[in-house]
Amino acid sequence: MPKVGMPKIRRPQLVSATMTVIDRVGLHGASVSLISQEAGVSSGIINHYFGGKHGLLEETMRDILRQLSCDATKRLNSLPKQAHMQRINAILDANFVGFQSESKVIKTWLAFWSYSMHDEALKRLQRVNEKRLLSHLKRELKALMSKEQADIVAQGIAALIDGIWLRGALNPEGINANKARIIINDYLEKQLTFYSQQ
């Protein structure tokens, strides 16, 4: 977590530089020295405000997660409360379109996922992100099916989002948001049909 007093103009600059360097050389090659060069600041600033590379990675992921949350909220707020299928697709778009699909963001996400398996602070951020996604999905799904069914289908959609996102991240052509929507909507329609016959 950055120390109080960190100039607000520096934080976005350092976060952007971190993602750019991870995009270029990977997480292990992304040294404090390279990041500070990219940001045009001294290494001492990173060490002083973030305690080093780990603290800067944590702040970078917080920023990415904030942007994801803001984008999802903005998309949801633009739609009627009763437009549940549209709102589910807005959640999908927040994960697959725009900022979240940029190469430097994708590579930072991959580094984050890898690191979060062995780091409590990053693992906590991952859990917060997962809970937020499931909460958004369940809110819409509960209007279409029972709470128990909504819990299961939300987990299925979240797994599809992660799987499609990971496959797209490893594909040189990147993430295909349209294909992601088709696959997930096909799954959702099948689940709705299945549960309507129960």
Curated annotation (Swiss-Prot):
Protein name, entry field: HTH-type transcriptional regulator BetI
Organism: Vibrio vulnificus (strain YJ016)
Domain HTH tetR-type: from-to ranges: 8-68
InterPro entries the record matches: BetI_C, DNA-bd_HTH_TetR-type_CS, Homeodomain-like_sf, HTH-type_TetR-like_transc_reg, HTH_TetR, Tet_transcr_reg_TetR-rel_C_sf, Tscrpt_rep_BetI
Pathway: Amine and polyamine biosynthesis; betaine biosynthesis via choline pathway [regulation]
UniProt entry keywords in alphabetical sequence: DNA-binding, Repressor, Transcription, Transcription regulation
DNA-binding region ranges: 31-50
Lineage: Bacteria, Pseudomonadati, Pseudomonadota, Gammaproteobacteria, Vibrionales
Keyword Transferase belongs to the record: no
Domain of life of the native organism: Bacteria
HAMAP family: HTH_type_BetI (MF_00768)
Record-level GO BP terms: glycine betaine biosynthetic process from choline; negative regulation of DNA-templated transcription
Protein role: Repressor involved in the biosynthesis of the osmoprotectant glycine betaine. It represses transcription of the choline transporter BetT and the genes of BetAB involved in the synthesis of glycine betaine.
Gene Ontology MF, one: transcription cis-regulatory region binding
Alphabetical list of NCBIfam families matching this protein: betaine_BetI, PRK00767.1
